[in-house]
Swiss-Prot record:
Belongs to the prefoldin alpha subunit family. Gene3D superfamilies: 1.10.287.370. GO terms for cellular component: cytoplasm; prefoldin complex. It holds the Pfam family Prefoldin. It comes from Methanococcus vannielii (strain ATCC 35089 / DSM 1224 / JCM 13029 / OCM 148 / SB). GO terms for biological process: protein folding. This is Prefoldin subunit alpha. SUPFAM superfamilies: Prefoldin. It is found in: Cytoplasm. One of its GO terms (molecular function) is unfolded protein binding. Heterohexamer of two alpha and four beta subunits. Its main location: cytoplasm. The keyword Chaperone applies. Keywords: Chaperone, Cytoplasm.
């Protein structure tokens, strides 16, 4: 196999790995988006009812009344907590959602570009394989007539 063909196969492999990593990143972003949306919904509900469902584990929950539903305590690092107004946290989370959506669009665009390149390289490799096969058949045909 010539060097150019080997390079195309290697490029194809690299591009496929890139697409896979980007798709994994998209999945992670989707999980973060879902988590933020749930948190925003919970805080919105908390503002009106003062009641929240606390997870106990294994799919079980308990309803609880919140003493101060206007304040949210955020973990901002290892053993570091920060108290903020619920409206401020909701706004921060919505801003984070916007940023995640923008990142998601960029990654999706990159996946599309990389996938097009994969398709282009595959097409070239298929043409070369067909040409090699045709050349091989032609050689066999000529050697059989001797």
């Amino acid at each position: 196999m010539n060097e150019e063909l080997q390079n195309q196969f290697m490029a194809l492999d690299v591009y496929n790995q890139q697409v896979q990593k980007l798709q994994e990143e998209l999945s992670n972003i989707d999980l973060m988006i879902m988590e933020l949306v749930r948190a925003i919904e919970s805080m919105e509900s908390l503002k009106t009812s003062g009641e929240i469902m606390l997870p106990l584990g294994a799919g079980s929950f308990v309803k609880a009344d919140v003493k101060n539903p206007e304040k949210i305590i955020l973990s901002v690092g290892v053993d570091v907590l920060l108290e903020k107004d619920v409206e401020e946290v909701i706004l921060d989370f919505k801003n984070s959602l916007d940023e995640l959506e923008k990142t998601k669009e960029l990654i999706t665009t990159q996946i599309q570009k990389t996938s097009k390149e994969v398709t282009r390289i595959r097409g070239e490799l298929e043409k070369r394989a067909a040409a090699i096969e045709k050349q091989s058949q032609t050689k066999r045909g000529h050697s059989g007539s001797n």
